[in-house]
Amino acid sequence: MFGYAVNLPDKLWKLFTLGEFIEGDNMYADENVIKIKHEVLYEVAKAAFDGNLDEIRDNIPFNIIPGPTPQFRCCIYKEREIIRQRVRLAEGKAPGAVDDGNIIQVISSACEDCPISSYTVTENCQNCLGKACINACKFGAIEAGRHRSHIDPAKCKECGKCAQACPYNAIAHLKRPCKFACPVNAITYNEYGISVIDEAKCIRCGKCIHSCPFGAIGSKTYIVNVIEALKDEGKKVYAMAAPATEGQFGPNITMNSWKKAMSALGFNGFVEVALGGDMTAASEADEWYEAYQAGEKKVTSCCPGFVNMVRRHYPDLADKISTTISPMAAVSRMIKAKDPDAVTVFIGPCIAKKSEVEDQKIEGNADYVLTYSEIRAIMRAKDVELEADDMSYQEGSVYGKRFANSGGVTAAVLESLKEKGIDAECKVCKANGAAECKKALLLMKAGKLPEDFIEGMACEGGCVGGPSSFNDMISTKKFRDDLLSKADDREIRANLKNYHMETFSMHRD
């Protein structure tokens, strides 16, 4: 299919060649979860193209789970209910009856069997005479049992003092994978033990999605919306591929590969969003320098997960967010400045980009966002594949292409300042991942941040490490380095002279 060899585990290679992969699960979950998720997306995409989704929607669970015996759960009825809820997500709906507006949703029927109690007494406990755990607990949550100590979950405050006090390491600290993965403590559980996402706290980063061993968390998709737009002869639909795309699919799948595949799929045009990286870098450079001269501190605005973190958890710092729009929004505005009726579709590894479209309401932004798994399901439904190609298509500089890496935004902004003849000694905190973002924002809130600016990336490694990435970071870096080494050395500001930047604004307001 691709014309080159990729070192992947056998089961992943099988899925890769079949196009059967799903948002990051190729790296984090097992083959069964991967296949089921993609089969749902494929079935919905195919039905949407065929125009019979309403007629066959109820048949999809039976097609995927034919029975008569269950494959993974207690019964085929539960398995089919899970598929039914996945179909709703694929259609852009909440899996259940209640929709809180979050793009990330828990599939309640699939959520089960994870431990609820954070601290648990294990069989290592010999009911010792010292009772250090009981003495350490200030909340009366531990009592001696017949064979071992017992922790009352209703009283436990999860302080961890008991585990620290036990000299025999008999108390284990357990967390649900989804709860442990969430960087902002947005996941709890209801009285039935089902995970619940606090919409007000959730930053839509998507870390919880690939952490669930049952695949019980997913995101709404725009698959049906995009297909309907592609089928409408009166609409011009443009695909926009994220800078993180290069390297995700090997050393020979270039932006030209994507351009040709999207054309075969029916898109009227294709733009690499690395161009938007150049646009954002130039605008951000001007904004940073103005703030630097005024002694003001700023934070970047291109990562929607980071922006959500600032607005939801550090609202006092919301005015520090750069007014410059993201590369995705920049390219979308450029396209719509030429064609006001254009439909723009962003393709990348980011779940939070869906939130940028839904929640931030930036005028002229992308209409729809697709993850790699979602666009591949659409491609599979039309028998379109990515093919190895050359590097003849390039619209962004190397700096714009490296926007997808942690530190890439900073490098591009400083390069843009340099090209403008400005030698500003700006100090930048490059916060790599949600944990570092939280630390940097806490310092800024306390007035103790030594740097002038924060480049915030909610995903470790930057966009290339997003929850919907296809490949692992090590392989992706190797492939990206190889591809980007072949790109030309155009400068950021010189490159932008080839585009009518005066026809649209680079700011939110």
Description of each model-found segment:
Residues C114-T120, E143-R148, Y189, K207, ...:
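Gly-rich Lys/Arg/Thr-decorated short loops/hinges at beta-loop-alpha junctions or inter-strand turns
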Residues G96-T122, F139-G140:
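N-terminal [4Fe-4S]-dependent radical SAM core
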Residues E112-S118, C128-I134, C159-C162, C205-C208, ...:
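Cysteine-cluster motifs in flexible loop/terminal segments that predominantly coordinate metals
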Residues G130-P153, K157, K161-D198, I203, ...:
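Iron-sulfur cluster-binding cysteine motifs and their immediate structural context
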Residues V121, D152, D198, A241-A242, ...:
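A secondary-structure boundary/capping signal
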Residues C128, K157, H173, I203, ...:
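Residue-level recognition of alpha-helix initiation/capping sites
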Residues F2-R86, A90-G92, S219-D509:
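Iron-sulfur-associated redox domains of electron-transfer enzymes in respiratory
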